[in-house]
């Protein structure tokens, strides 16, 4: 059961990679520091809320909110600077694990704030832990940044017709027949193709049909005259009709 609790000999559960000294120097800085690091905060927790909670441990000198380096908005952590070491110890002892803005927060000793540490270190601007997080956390922006990018890419692919959209609203024609978005386009395209083929066939058959029509007219018209016919034959035909 001892593994369920913090090691009392360790002042902090993490080691800041920006600290340039040795491990011994790092631990010495933690023992003398009046700064605590607060993690697992909601993106929507304000500085006033943090002040109200941490002032119960002692008088606060300064609060530095952690910010997304791109959007300059809170990204889930902060630094609390006290005036005394005793107050910092009380904050770690009594406030770590309590609820702030409906979230259990983590409080650790910090070796001391320096300019630049207020910015998130993740590739997307926020904290590294929020880059590849696959669980949905509404207090920290939903899914992790990389997961959100994948979801946005899938939505864009669907919007541009690159993938099937299962929830697309159906369309109805006059016969109340369901069809997808692409059916009207395909029907129009097929119609144009059929019309083009019919026109092409009609143009190819036009000379033959005209020739047949002329031949029929020539059979019905007794006065249709072939080559070599003379006006005398027409006169004989008129005389026979008058008789």
Swiss-Prot record:
Cited SUPFAM superfamilies: RNA-binding domain, RBD
Composition bias, Basic and acidic residues: 128-138, 173-228
GO cellular component: cytoplasm; nuclear cap binding complex; nucleus
Alphabetized UniProt keyword annotations: Cytoplasm, mRNA processing, mRNA splicing, Nucleus, RNA-binding, RNA-mediated gene silencing
Primary site of residence: nucleus
Pfam families: RRM_1
GO BP annotations listed: abscisic acid-activated signaling pathway involved in stomatal movement; alternative mRNA splicing, via spliceosome; defense response to virus; mRNA cis splicing, via spliceosome; mRNA splicing, via spliceosome; primary miRNA processing; RNA splicing, via endonucleolytic cleavage and ligation
Molecular functions (GO terms): RNA cap binding
Cellular location(s): Nucleus; Cytoplasm
Domain RRM: 34-112
PROSITE patterns the record matches: RRM (PS50102)
Xref: InterPro entries: NCBP2, NCBP2_RRM, Nucleotide-bd_a/b_plait_sf, RBD_domain_sf, RRM_dom
Residue ranges, annotated region (Disordered): 120-144, 161-243
Residues reported in the UniProt entry to bind mRNA: 14, 37, 106-110, 117-121, 127-128
Summary of the function given for this chain in its UniProt record: Component of the cap-binding complex (CBC), which binds co-transcriptionally to the 5' cap of pre-mRNAs and is involved in various processes such as pre-mRNA splicing and RNA-mediated gene silencing (RNAi) by microRNAs (miRNAs). The CBC complex is involved in miRNA-mediated RNA interference and is required for primary miRNA processing. In the CBC complex, CBP20 recognizes and binds capped RNAs (m7GpppG-capped RNA) but requires ABH1/CBP80 to stabilize the movement of its N-terminal loop and lock the CBC into a high affinity cap-binding state with the cap structure.
Assembly behavior: Component of the nuclear cap-binding complex (CBC), a heterodimer composed of ABH1/CBP80 and CBP20 that interacts with m7GpppG-capped RNA.
Family: Belongs to the RRM NCBP2 family.
Name of the molecule in the record: Nuclear cap-binding protein subunit 2
């Amino acid at each position: 059961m001892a593994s369920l609790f913090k090691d009392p000999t360790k002042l902090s559960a993490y080691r800041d990679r920006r600290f340039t000294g040795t491990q011994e120097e790092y631990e010495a800085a933690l023992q003398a520091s009046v700064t605590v690091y607060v993690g697992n905060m909601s993106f929507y927790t304000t500085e006033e809320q943090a002040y109200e909670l941490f002032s119960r441990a002692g008088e606060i000198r300064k609060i530095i909110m952690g910010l997304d380096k791109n959007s300059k908005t809170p990204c889930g952590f902060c630094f609390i600077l006290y005036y005394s070491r005793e107050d910092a110890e009380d904050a770690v002892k009594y406030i770590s694990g309590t609820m702030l803005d409906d979230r259990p927060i983590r409080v650790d000793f910090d070796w001391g704030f320096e300019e630049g540490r207020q910015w998130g270190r993740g590739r997307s601007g926020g904290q590294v832990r929020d880059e590849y997080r696959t669980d949905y956390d509404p207090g920290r922006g939903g899914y992790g940044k990389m997961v959100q990018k994948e979801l946005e890419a899938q939505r864009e692919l669907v919007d541009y017709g690159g993938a099937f959209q299962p929830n697309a609203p159906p369309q109805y024609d006059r016969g109340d027949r369901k069809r997808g978005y692409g059916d009207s386009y395909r029907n129009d395209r097929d119609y144009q193709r059929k019309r083009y083929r019919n026109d092409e066939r009609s143009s190819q058959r036009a000379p033959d049909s005209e020739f047949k029509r002329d031949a029929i007219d020539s059979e019905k018209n007794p006065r249709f005259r072939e080559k070599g016919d003379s006006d005398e034959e027409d006169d004989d035909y008129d005389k026979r009709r008058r008789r």
